[in-house]
UniProtKB/Swiss-Prot annotation:
This is Formin-like protein 5. The gene is FH5. It holds the Pfam family FH2. It comes from the Eukaryota. Residues 1188-1588 form the FH2 domain.
Length: 1627
C-alpha cells in the first residue's frame, strides 16, 4: 500500500486546496484571521516556492476577490514572481455576486487560460477577508462552465462544503444561495459558446406583488419598503447606484397583514442588466430597518415581463424560516421601457370600445415640439427587429405610454392598435436648437423660404420681419405601427404659413405611449424654389426603431407666432392590420383656445373660405434613401379669420396661439407601413415641385388585414380634413400627399406621374363633421358599407398659386414643372389615390390663368354619403396598388390604355370596415403635350405658354393620366365640408366628385387594374385647362377586412377623347344649405362634362356594387369594385333610384365603360345587410344556404359502429371465404326499423321551450358549471380535493375539530395553499346565481368562507400537528449538545493528548518565535497532518500516534469518551434557536387565534375546545424547552472558552467540527501506523526466513566430500550450471 501511494498519490502543495485539475484555492480564504504585512508576504512566498518546486514548467494566474479600490496586496507581492493577478470585487451592491458581464469575463479568461495547448497553466483562487462567498460562487460557475461538474445545486453545495458551514454567515446577514443558484442557471443556460454575455434589454420595474405577506412584526405582517440597485442605463458610467428608493413617509409605507394579500408595492424605475432588489421591513417608528429578502437578477433572462419568486428564490436571513412560510410567493412585474412616465407632462387615457386614445398635453403652450424617431429600411427586411434609438430635441417631454415591444419587436395584441395623437404648436420666440426634421431654409427672391434637407440637421432661422399674419413652425409628425412591428413616421416643419396645422401621430400598442421618436433622413432631396411658395422639408422615416423610454417633442427654434387664427384638426388614429385609421375627434386651436370635439355626424355648413395653397409632398426613394414632404403655400392669399370654436379637449394644457390669419391649410402625414415608399417628384435646380397630402377626417371601427403587395410594397392611407367654417374668397388650399416608389434615377426633363400611396376619404359637408376612417387592408379590396370615396384632386402650377375648394378633402397628387413641357415618363405604378370627399375637387398648379379640367378617370371607388343624413358608419379605404408606368408619353399622343372602371362606392352607413388597396391599373398612355399627371400623384403642372419647366416625376412611375392642354390659371377646387358639401368655386371634383362651382368637369382618376392585367377604363377627355387627376382609390373591403380584387372589365374602354376637346365648366355648386351631389362624371371627349348624380347610399350595405347607370340626381359615380379573391367582384350597385344607386363611371369616348362582372361569392349590392359580410375571409361574401350540399351525401339514420374496416380480404382468410360465398350480404337478417328505433343517429332537437327541460333530462345532459375562479387555479384546487376523499362539509368540520387522524399535515398545508384570496372572496360574494351550478373549486371556497378566518385556523391546525414532533426533535438535539459538552470537558484522555501535542509543538518550534507556547488554537490540530517528514512517508499526526502507541497506548482510544461528538457536529445552535423561536411565536399565534375565535359564534365552539386543551399542554412544553435551550447555550459557550477560544470569533459548531476532524485524522493515522507496522513485521519475518535458508544451504554444501574423478570430467558448461544453481539456492 505504501508503495502504491508512493508512485500514484499526487501530493498537493501545502496551504493550497485543490478544487479540480490545475485549479487551487489558498487556504487563507477559509480563515477569518488577518495576517500582518510580513506574515502575509512570508505566507505567499512559501506557497510560491512550493509551486515552483512542484510545477517547475507551469505558468500561474491568480484570480483575487477583494474589496479595495487600489492595487491589492497579493498583486504587489506576486508580481515579483511574474504571476498574473486578476482583481475582482467581492460583492455587487451588498450581494456576494458579480455582474453577469464580469462573471462572463472571469469564465472566459479562466477557460482560455486553462485551455492553452502545450502549456501547463494553473489557476489559483484567492480572496481577502469576507470574499469566500463570491469565491465559492465563481468556483462553482467555473466548474459548471467547463463541464467538470453538472447540476447547479450539487456543485454549489460541494464548493460550500470546502469551508465550515457557518463561514458565510460571518460576512453576510442573508443567505446568498438563492441568488447564486439563479446566476448559475444563467451560466448553464448560456453555455460556453457565446463570446459575449447576452444583451440585457431595458425594462421598467413596475412593482412587486406579494401573494403571501412575510411575518415581521408582532401581528404577523410587515411594512414593506423597496430599494432597487443597478446600473443607470442612461449614463455611460457602469457603476451601480440606487435606482429607486421609496419615500419614508406614512403615506407610502403602509403596513399589510396576512389577510390583505396580494400586496402590490410600486417601484416604477428603469432597469437594465444586473439588478438588486431589496425588500425591507420598516418599524412603526419608520426608523428601524430589517431586510426581509433580497433578489439579484439580470434583465436579459426575464421572460414574459414577470419574475416569479418563491421561498427558495429569495435571499433571506439565516434565521427567517418562520417568517416566510413554505408557500411564500411573490412576483416582480416589469413592462417595456416605453411605459416610463416622466413627470413633465400629463396623460389622459380614453378607452372607447377597444379604441384607445392617449392625449398628452404639453406643459407649455409656447413651445413647439418635434418628435424624432430612428428608422431603418423596412423594404429590405420587413421582418427585422428594429433597434433602439432615441434623440431628444426640445425642452419638454411628452408624457404618455410607450408602445410595448418584446425583444425588440412589437407585439400586436389586437387587430386595432392604438395610435396617439399629439398636438403641438410652436408659439412665441424660441432658442436656437437643431431640428431633427432635415430642412434647410433657402431664401427666395420672391420671399419664398424653402426647407431643404441633405442628410444633415439644419436649424430654422427666425424671421424677425414676419408680418402679423405669418404663422411659423408647423410640424406634422406621423408614425404608425404595422403588424410586423415596424413604425413609420414623418416630420413636417413649415415657416410663414398662414394655414397652420400641426399634427403628430405617434403609434402605440397600448393606450399609454411615451416613445421617443426620431426621424432621420436617408437621402438628400432637392427642393426647388417657387417665387411665392414656402416649402418645408418633410422627412418620412421608414422604420421605427424599438421605442425608447419617452417621447420628447423638441421645440423648433427661433420662430415667433403672431396674430394667428390657427385651426388645428387632429384625428385620433388606429392601426388596423397595417393601416393607419383616423377615428376619433377633431381638435381645434383658435386664438389660443385649444379644444376638442368629437362628433358622430358630419354636419357642417361652411362658407367658401379663403385658403392658402399648401402642398405637402412626401418623398420616399425606392432605394431606401430619403423621405421628404414639402408644404408649399401661397403667400398672396388674403387673410381670413377662423370662427372661434371650442371643443372638449383631452389635452390638459391649451396651446395658446397668437392671432394669425389661417387659410385652412391642413396637413396630415400618412402612417406608413413596412416598405412604404413615398413618391415625390424632383426637378432640376430652379424647377418646382408640389406635393399634396389629402387628409380625410374619419372615425372608424374597422378591422382588416393588410396584404402584401408585390415587391413587398405598402400603401399609405392619407387623410383629407376639410377646414371647418372658414370663409374662402378663392378656392381653398388643398394639401396633397403623394408617395414615391421606384428608382430615383429617372429623367429630370420628363415629369413622371407619381403614385400616391394614399386613400382619401370623403368628408361629408354637414356642419358637424364626422370622422371617417382611412384604412388599407392586406387583401384585395372589397366593398362594404362606408362613406363615399374622396375625389382625387390634381395640382398644377399656375402663377405660383394653389387654390383648392374650401372644406373639400384633397387628394394626394404631385405635380412638377420641368423647364420644357414634356410628358412625364411612367414612374413605377403606385396605387391611385382615392379622392377625399364628394366635394373634393381637382387642384392644379400652373402659370396659365385658365383652368382646364383633365379627362375624368373612372369614378372614385367610394361615393360620398348622401348629404342630408350624417353618416355614422366608420370605414377606411386602402390605397389602390400602384398603377403600371405610362406606356408612352408622346408629344401629341392621345391614346391611353384604358384602366378598369373605378370600383363603385360602398354604402356609407356601415359601421366599420377597411378597404384594401386596389391593384395597380395598367400603364396609361398619355398623348397630350401638356403634362401627364400620374393617376395617383398630381400630374406635373404645365405652363406651356409661360414655358414653365415641368419637373420630372419621382422614380416610381405611376401611370399619369393623359397630359392636358397647358393651363394658364391655377385650378381651384372647392372641397365640401362634412355631409352637405357647399359648392365651391371652379374646381371639377374627381370621380366621387363633390359639387363644384366655377370649375370644369372633374376628372375622376382611373381605377388601377388588379394584378396589372385589367386595363383601366379610359379616362375622361382631357380638359384644356388642367391635367388629369389621379385615379380614384379602390373601394373599401368588407368588414371582415378581406377585400375582393376588382374584376377585370369585360372589354377595355376606348381611348380618352383628344386633348383638344374642351369640356364645359361643371355645373355651379348648389347653395350651401342645399344637398349638393358630387360632380358629374366626365363627359365624352369633346363634350362638356355634366355633374354626375350622387347616389344616396341608404341602408348599411356591405360591398359597394359596380356603378349603376347614371341617374338624373347628382351623385358621385361609384367606380367598379376591384375583383375579390378568386376573381370575384361585388355586384353592381342598384340604379340611382335605389338606396345606394349612383351614376355609372364616365363612359369612354365612343365606347362604353365595361361594367365589372360580379363573380360568385361577390358581396351583395349595396343596401344589403352588412352583417352578412362580417367574418368572411378575403372580403368575399360566401353564399351560405341551409340546404346547400344537403344532398351531396346521404346521411345514415343509424348510429355508426366505430370499427376498423378491412378493405381487402387476404387470401385464405375468413373474409375471403365470406366473399366467395357471397351469401352473407345477400339477405339482411336484421330489422332495419327496429335498428332505427333502438340505435337512431343523433339528430338536433328543436329548441322547444316547453319540452326543452324534459328533453335535456332524457338525454342526460349536465348543466354547465359556472367557473368564477381562474381556470388554472381552479383545476389545481380540484386536483388537490381529489386527494382529500371526503365531502367538503366534513372536510371543514375535521379541520375545525383539529382531527389529526383524518387530515395529515400535508393535506392541511394544501388546504392552506388553496384558501381563497381576498379578490376571490369578493368575486364569490358578488355571485347571485345558483350556487349549485358553481364548479367544485368555487363550492370549496364557499365552504371555507362560511368559517371566519379559515386560513388562520388551518395554520393553527398545521402547527398543532407538527408541534409534538418539533418539540421532540428540539429536545433531542439539545440533549445531544448537552451530553457532548459534558463528555469533552470530562475526558481525561483528551486532555492528556492535548498536552502531548503542546509538548511536541514546543519541541519543534524551540528557539523560534513560535516556541515556548502555553497553548495553541484549536484549529492548529488540523495542521498536524500538513507537516510531513522529509521522506514524505510520515506526518506529525502519524508520529504522534506512533509515540502514543509506544509510550501511552491507553490514550489511543480517547475518542471512546466522545460518543456524542459526531451527532453534535450535525446540529447547529443557530438552527435550534430559529426553531425554538418558531415554536414560541407559533404558540403565540395559536393563542391569538383562540382569542379571536371567541366572537365567531357556534361555528368555532369545537375548535376553541380542542385548542384550549392543546394550548395548556403546549405552554408547559415550550417553557421547559426554553429553559433547556438556555442551559445548553451556556454550556456551549463554556466549552468554547475551555479551549481558550472567543465565542464571538469561534462558534460552537466550529469547535465541534474541529474536534471531530481531529479525531477522524487521529484514528486514520493510527490505523495507517498499525497497518504499516504489520507490513514491516511481515517483511522482517520474511527476510529472516530467507537468511536462515541461505545459511542452511551453505552449510549443507560445505559438508559434502569432494570427488576428483567427477571434477575432472566436468566441463566448463557443467561448472557454470552448478554455480548458477547454487546462486539460485542462496537467493
Amino acid at each position: 500500500m505504501a508503495l502504491f501511494r508512493k508512485f500514484f498519490l499526487k501530493k498537493t502543495p501545502d496551504r493550497l486546496l485543490e478544487i479540480s485539475e490545475r485549479v487551487y484555492v489558498f487556504d487563507c480564504c477559509f480563515s477569518t484571521d488577518s495576517m500582518g504585512e510580513d506574515e502575509y508576504r512570508d505566507y505567499l512566498s512559501g506557497i510560491v516556492a512550493q509551486l515552483q518546486d512542484y510545477f517547475p514548467d507551469a505558468s500561474f494566474m491568480v484570480s483575487n476577490f477583494w474589496s479595495g479600490d487600489k492595487r491589492s496586496r497579493i498583486s504587489d507581492i506576486l508580481s515579483e514572481y511574474d504571476m498574473t493577478v486578476m482583481d475582482y470585487p467581492q460583492q455587487y451592491e451588498g450581494c456576494p455576486l458579480l455582474q453577469l458581464e464580469m462573471i462572463h469575463h472571469f469564465l472566459k479568461s479562466c477557460e482560455n487560460w486553462l485551455s492553452v495547448e502545450g502549456q501547463h497553466n494553473m489557476l489559483l483562487m484567492h480572496c481577502e477577508r469576507g470574499g469566500w462567498p463570491v469565491l465559492a460562487f465563481m468556483l462553482a460557475g467555473l466548474l459548471l462552465y467547463r463541464k467538470t461538474y453538472t447540476g447547479e445545486q450539487k456543485t454549489l453545495e460541494m464548493v460550500y462544503k470546502q469551508a465550515r458551514r457557518d463561514f458565510i454567515q460571518q460576512f453576510f446577514p442573508l443567505n446568498p444561495q438563492s441568488s447564486h443558484m439563479r446566476y448559475l442557471h444563467y451560466i448553464t443556460r448560456q453555455g460556453s459558446g457565446p463570446e459575449k454575455p447576452p444583451i440585457s434589454r431595458p425594462l421598467i420595474l413596475d412593482s412587486i406583488v406579494l401573494h403571501v405577506v412575510p411575518r415581521f412584526d408582532a401581528e404577523g405582517g410587515c411594512r414593506p419598503y423597496l430599494r432597487v440597485h443597478g446600473q443607470d442605463s442612461s449614463s455611460s458610467n457602469k457603476s451601480a447606484k440606487v435606482l429607486y428608493e421609496m419615500p419614508k413617509t406614512k403615506k407610502h409605507l403602509q403596513r399589510y397583514g396576512q389577510a390583505e394579500v396580494p400586496v402590490k408595492v410600486g417601484a416604477f424605475c428603469r432597469v437594465q442588466g444586473d439588478v438588486v432588489l431589496e425588500c425591507i421591513h420598516i418599524g412603526d417608528n419608520l426608523d428601524h430597518e430589517e431586510i426581509m429578502f433580497r433578489v439579484m437578477f439580470n434583465t436579459a433572462f426575464i421572460q414574459s415581463n414577470i419574475l416569479g419568486l418563491n421561498r427558495d428564490d429569495i435571499d433571506v436571513s439565516w434565521n427567517s424560516n418562520n417568517q416566510f412560510p413554505r408557500d411564500f410567493r411573490a412576483e416582480v412585474v416589469f413592462s417595456d421601457p416605453g411605459s416610463f412616465k416622466p413627470a413633465a407632462a400629463t396623460v389622459e387615457e380614453v378607452d372607447d370600445d377597444g379604441d384607445e386614445t392617449d392625449v398628452a398635453s404639453v406643459d407649455t403652450g409656447e413651445e413647439f415640439y418635434e418628435a424624432e424617431e430612428d428608422w431603418h429600411d423596412a423594404r429590405r427586411d420587413p421582418e427585422t427587429q428594429s433597434t433602439d434609438g432615441r434623440t431628444s430635441i426640445g425642452d419638454a417631454e411628452l408624457d404618455g405610454g410607450v408602445s410595448r415591444e418584446d425583444s425588440g419587436s412589437l407585439e400586436k395584441h389586437r387587430a386595432d392598435e392604438d395610435v396617439k395623437i399629439v398636438i403641438s404648436q410652436n408659439l412665441g420666440c424660441m432658442s436656437d436648437r437643431p431640428v431633427s426634421a432635415p430642412a434647410e431654409i433657402l431664401g427666395n427672391p420672391g420671399g419664398l423660404q424653402q426647407a431643404c434637407e441633405n442628410e444633415e440637421m439644419p436649424k430654422l432661422s427666425n424671421r424677425s420681419d414676419q408680418d402679423d399674419n405669418a404663422v411659423q413652425d408647423i410640424q406634422v409628425v406621423a408614425a404608425s405601427v404595422d403588424s410586423e412591428g415596424h413604425k413609420f413616421g414623418s416630420i413636417c416643419q413649415k415657416e410663414d404659413m398662414k394655414g397652420v396645422i400641426a399634427q403628430t401621430l405617434v403609434t402605440a400598442i397600448d393606450p399609454s405611449c411615451s416613445d421617443e421618436v426620431q426621424c432621420q433622413p436617408d437621402e438628400s432631396a432637392k427642393i426647388l424654389k417657387y417665387p411665392n411658395l414656402d416649402y418645408t422639408g418633410f422627412s418620412s422615416p421608414r422604420t421605427l426603431s424599438s421605442v425608447d423610454e419617452d417621447t420628447r417633442l423638441g421645440t423648433i427654434p427661433n420662430v415667433a407666432l403672431q396674430n394667428a387664427d390657427v385651426k388645428i384638426i387632429t384625428e385620433s388614429t388606429v392601426i388596423v392590420d397595417n393601416e393607419l385609421v383616423i377615428y376619433e375627434e377633431k381638435t381645434i386651436v383658435d386664438n389660443g383656445n385649444l379644444t376638442q370635439e368629437v362628433k358622430n355626424v358630419v354636419n357642417e355648413e361652411s362658407t367658401t373660405p379663403k385658403l392658402d395653397r399648401s402642398v405637402i409632398e412626401s418623398v420616399d426613394s425606392q432605394d431606401n434613401k430619403n423621405h421628404k414632404m414639402e408644404v408649399a403655400k401661397a403667400a398672396d392669399t388674403t387673410d381670413s379669420k377662423m370662427e372661434q370654436t371650442k371643443l372638449k379637449s383631452g389635452l390638459e394644457d391649451a396651446i395658446s396661439l397668437k392671432k394669425t390669419t389661417v387659410q385652412g391649410s391642413i396637413v396630415v402625414l400618412p402612417a406608413t407601413e413596412i416598405a412604404t415608399k413615398i413618391k415625390t417628384k424632383r426637378e432640376e435646380s430652379g424647377g418646382r415641385r408640389d406635393v399634396g397630402i389629402s387628409l380625410p377626417q374619419s372615425k372608424i371601427e374597422a378591422r382588416a388585414k393588410s396584404p402584401r403587395i408585390s415587391s413587398d410594397r405598402r400603401q399609405i392611407p392619407d387623410k383629407v380634413v376639410p377646414s371647418k367654417k372658414m370663409p374662402v374668397d378663392h378656392a381653398p388650399e388643398a394639401v396633397l400627399l403623394e408617395e414615391k416608389l421606384g428608382n430615383s434615377d429617372q429623367s429630370q426633363e420628363q415629369p413622371k406621374a407619381v403614385k400616391p400611396k394614399t386613400v382619401r376619404r370623403w368628408i361629408s359637408p354637414n356642419k358637424e363633421s364626422e370622422t371617417t376612417s382611412v384604412h388599407r387592408p392586406s387583401h384585395p379590396p372589397s366593398r362594404y358599407d362606408s362613406s363615399p370615396a374622396a375625389l382625387a384632386i390634381h395640382s398644377m402650377h399656375t402663377n405660383n398659386k394653389f387654390n383648392v375648394g374650401k372644406d373639400a378633402p384633397l387628394v394626394s397628387s404631385g405635380a412638377q414643372a420641368v423647364p420644357k413641357i414634356q410628358a412625364a415618363p411612367p414612374p413605377p405604378p403606385p396605387p391611385p389615390p382615392p379622392y377625399a370627399s364628394s366635394s373634393s375637387l381637382s387642384m392644379h398648379m400652373g402659370s396659365a390663368t385658365k383652368q382646364q379640367p383633365p379627362p375624368p378617370p373612372p369614378p372614385p371607388p367610394l361615393p360620398p354619403p348622401p348629404p342630408p343624413p350624417a353618416s355614422s358608419g366608420l370605414s377606411s379605404i386602402p390605397p389602390p396598388p400602384p398603377p403600371p408606368p405610362l406606356m408612352s408619353f408622346g408629344a401629341q399622343t392621345r391614346t391611353f390604355v384604358p384602366p378598369p372602371p373605378p370600383p363603385p362606392p360602398p354604402p356609407r352607413s356601415g359601421v366599420g370596415g377597411n378597404t384594401p388597396p386596389a391593384p395597380p391599373p395598367p400603364p396609361l398612355r398619355s398623348t397630350v403635350p401638356a403634362i401627364s399627371p400620374p393617376p395617383p400623384p398630381p400630374p406635373p403642372p404645365l405652363k406651356p405658354s409661360s414655358g414653365a419647366p415641368c419637373p420630372p416625376p419621382p422614380p416610381p412611375p405611376p401611370p399619369p393620366p393623359p397630359p392636358s392642354a397647358p393651363s394658364s390659371r391655377a385650378f381651384s377646387s372647392a372641397p365640401p365640408p362634412p355631409p352637405p358639401p357647399p359648392l365651391l368655386r371652379s374646381v371639377p371634383p374627381p370621380p366621387p366628385p363633390p359639387p363644384i362651382s366655377h370649375s370644369n368637369a372633374p376628372p375622376p382618376p382611373p381605377l388601377p387594374a388588379a394584378r396589372f392585367n385589367a386595363p383601366p377604363p379610359p379616362p375622361p377627355p382631357p380638359t384644356t385647362h388642367f391635367n388629369a387627376p389621379p385615379p380614384p382609390p379602390p373601394p373599401p373591403i368588407t368588414r371582415s377586412g378581406a377585400p375582393p380584387s376588382p374584376p377585370p372589365p369585360p372589354s377595355p374602354p376606348p381611348p380618352p377623347p383628344p386633348p383638344g376637346a374642351r369640356p364645359g365648366p361643371p355645373p355651379p355648386p348648389p347653395p350651401p344649405g342645399a344637398r349638393p351631389g358630387p360632380p358629374p362624371p366626365p363627359p365624352p371627349p369633346g363634350g362638356r362634362p355634366s355633374a354626375p348624380p350622387l347616389p344616396p347610399p341608404g341602408g348599411r350595405a356591405s360591398a359597394p356594387p359596380p356603378p349603376p347607370p347614371p341617374s338624373t340626381r347628382l351623385g358621385a359615380p361609384p367606380p367598379p369594385p376591384p375583383p375579390g379573391a378568386g376573381g370575384r367582384a361585388p355586384p353592381p350597385p342598384p340604379a340611382p333610384g335605389g338606396r345606394l344607386g349612383g351614376p355609372p363611371p364616365p363612359p369612354p369616348p365612343g365606347g362604353r365603360a365595361p361594367p365589372p362582372p360580379r363573380g360568385p361569392g361577390a358581396p351583395p349590392p349595396p343596401g344589403g345587410n352588412p352583417s352578412s359580410l362580417i367574418g368572411r375571409g378575403r372580403g368575399v361574401v360566401r353564399a351560405s344556404g341551409s340546404g346547400f350540399g344537403a344532398a351531396a351525401a346521404r346521411k345514415s339514420t343509424l348510429k355508426p359502429l366505430h370499427w376498423i374496416k378491412v378493405t381487402r380480404a387476404l387470401q385464405g382468410s375468413l373474409w375471403e371465404e365470406l366473399q366467395r360465398n357471397d351469401d352473407s350480404q345477400s339477405v339482411s337478417e336484421f330489422d332495419l326499423s327496429e335498428l332505427e328505433s333502438l340505435f337512431p343517429a343523433a339528430v338536433p332537437k328543436p329548441n322547444d321551450s316547453s319540452k326543452s327541460d324534459s328533453r335535456r333530462k332524457s338525454l342526460g345532459s349536465k348543466p354547465e358549471k359556472v367557473h368564477l375562479i381562474e381556470l388554472r387555479r381552479a383545476n389545481n384546487t380540484e386536483i388537490m380535493l381529489t386527494k382529500v376523499k371526503m365531502p367538503l362539509p366534513d372536510l371543514v368540520s375535521a379541520a375545525l375539530a383539529l382531527d389529526q387522524s383524518t387530515l395529515d399535515v400535508d393535506q392541511v398545508e394544501n388546504l392552506i395553499k388553496f384558501c381563497p384570496t381576498k379578490e376571490e372572496m369578493e368575486l364569490l360574494k358578488n355571485y347571485t346565481g345558483d350556487k349549485e351550478n358553481l364548479g367544485k373549486c368555487e363550492q370549496f371556497f364557499l365552504e371555507l368562507m362560511k368559517v371566519p378566518r379559515m386560513e388562520s385556523k388551518l395554520r393553527v391546525f398545521s402547527f398543532k400537528i407538527q408541534f409534538g414532533s418539533q418539540v421532540a426533535d428540539l429536545r433531542k438535539s439539545l440533549n445531544t449538545i448537552d451530553s457532548s459538552c459534558d463528555e469533552i470537558r470530562s475526558s481525561l484522555k483528551l486532555k492528556e493528548i492535548m498536552k502531548k501535542i503542546l509538548l511536541l509543538g514546543n519541541t519543534l518550534n524551540q528557539g523560534t518565535a513560535r516556541g515556548a507556547a502555553v497553548g495553541f488554537r484549536l484549529d492548529s490540530l488540523l495542521k498536524l497532518t500538513d507537516t510531513r517528514a522529509t521522506n514524505n512517508k510520515m506526518t506529525l499526526m502519524h508520529y504522534l500516534c506512533k509515540v502514543l502507541a509506544a509510550k501511552s497506548s491507553q490514550l489511543l482510544d480517547f475518542y471512546m469518551d466522545l460518543v456524542s461528538l459526531e451527532a453534535t457536529s450535525k446540529i447547529q445552535l443557530k438552527m435550534l434557536a430559529e426553531e425554538m423561536q418558531a415554536v414560541s411565536k407559533g404558540l403565540e399565534k395559536v393563542q391569538l387565534e383562540y382569542n379571536a375565535s371567541e366572537s365567531d359564534g357556534p361555528v368555532s365552539e369545537i375548535f376553541r375546545e380542542k385548542l384550549k386543551e392543546f394550548t395548556d399542554n403546549a405552554g408547559a412544553d415550550v417553557q421547559s424547552l426554553s429553559s433547556l435551550f438556555s442551559e445548553v447555550g451556556k454550556k456551549a459557550d463554556a466549552l468554547i472558552k475551555y479551549f481558550g477560544e472567543d465565542p464571538v470569533r469561534c462558534p460552537f459548531e466550529q469547535v465541534i467540527s474541529t474536534l471531530l476532524t481531529f479525531v477522524t485524522m487521529f484514528r486514520k493515522a493510527h490505523e495507517e501506523n498499525r497497518k504499516q507496522a504489520e507490513l514491516d513485521k511481515k517483511r522482517a519475518e520474511k527476510e529472516a526466513e530467507a537468511e536462515k535458508s541461505k545459511a542452511q544451504l551453505a552449510s549443507k554444501n560445505d559438508s559434502k566430500p569432494s570427488n576428483p574423478s567427477r571434477q575432472v570430467k566436468q566441463t566448463p558448461d557443467t561448472k557454470t550450471r552448478a554455480a548458477s544453481r547454487r546462486g539460485k539456492d542462496v537467493g
